Every structure is written in structure tokens, then in C-alpha cells.
Design a protein with these regions (language model features):
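Beta/alpha (TIM)-barrel catalytic core signal, keyed to glycine-rich beta->alpha loops juxtaposed to Asp/Glu
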Residues: 1-146
Length: 146
């Protein structure tokens, strides 16, 4: 191939965070998060200047819908709501801002034609989450830190 690969679309969200889970869980064989399922694609892309585009950034699972305002994710939605209120944006904007805050400089793919939803997603660019907020949201999604 003569044209270099400049982006890669991968499923990634605060709820579908396998791209970053494995290194954090690698010494814990009691959880499925310790299994390397992606061949270190995040590190590969960063080393080769390939931009990761997060597709389905608000989805959980493949066909289960969004995690935002979903009663199956009460802790995550509570945390998203607290940060959203403080920042003056929606929970959707905070969920996207969480992706944008990652040092890999990811892009989020907005798979919607709804103008209100697009505005919420664009509002994420107004928010720069602190490291503390980023990790608190990660923990609220049911993950843990070493």
C-alpha cells in the first residue's frame, strides 16, 4: 500500500474502554479486563501517528443503545451529570470530552443527523476535563485503578 494509514476507527467510549483497560488490569487474572484483546492497537497507532476515531462513542454493547441516561448505568450517569452541571454542558458533551481528553488525541465520530445531538457533541470541545474528573468518570463506569 502506497498511501500511509492516517486514521483507524475503533469502538471506544467511557463504557467501552477496552483500549485502555488491559494495561491497568494486566496483573489481575480475576477479571476479563486483563485479557489483551486488541493487540495493543492504541500504542501502535500512537507510535505511528495514526489518529484513532472513536466510533459509537455513546454506545454500550453493539445494539443495546446509549449509556447516557440509561438506568443500567446509574453511577456513571450521576458522575456525568455532576461534571456536566459544573461545566454547563450536557452529559453527552462530557462523555465525548472524556474521549477527547485522552493523550492519544482521539476524534469522536458523531453518527447522528439530529441537530440537537450534534450541538451536544460539539460542546465537548469547550470542556477540558481535569485528570481527576477523567479518572472519576472512569471509576464511575465500573472500572478500577491499581
Amino acid at each position: 500500500m502506497k498511501q500511509p494509514l492516517v486514521f483507524n476507527q475503533l469502538q471506544f467510549s467511557i463504557e467501552q474502554s477496552q483500549l485502555i483497560d488491559q494495561p491497568l488490569y494486566m496483573n489481575n487474572k480475576t477479571t476479563e479486563f486483563s485479557i489483551n484483546r486488541d493487540g495493543d492497537i492504541l500504542d501502535y497507532c500512537r507510535l505511528h501517528d495514526i489518529t484513532i476515531q472513536a466510533w459509537s462513542p455513546l454506545q454500550h454493547g453493539f445494539f443495546k443503545g446509549t449509556f447516557v441516561d440509561n438506568p443500567d448505568f446509574p453511577e456513571l450517569n450521576k458522575a456525568l451529570g455532576e461534571v456536566a452541571e459544573r461545566e454547563g454542558v450536557s452529559k453527552t458533551a462530557i462523555a465525548i470530552a472524556w474521549i477527547l481528553r485522552h493523550p492519544a488525541q482521539m476524534q469522536a465520530i458523531a453518527g447522528t443527523m439530529n441537530p440537537d445531538h450534534l450541538r451536544d457533541i460539539c460542546d465537548a470541545s469547550k470542556v477540558k476535563l481535569s485528570h481527576h474528573d477523567w479518572y472519576q468518570l472512569y471509576l464511575a463506569a465500573g472500572k478500577y485503578l491499581p
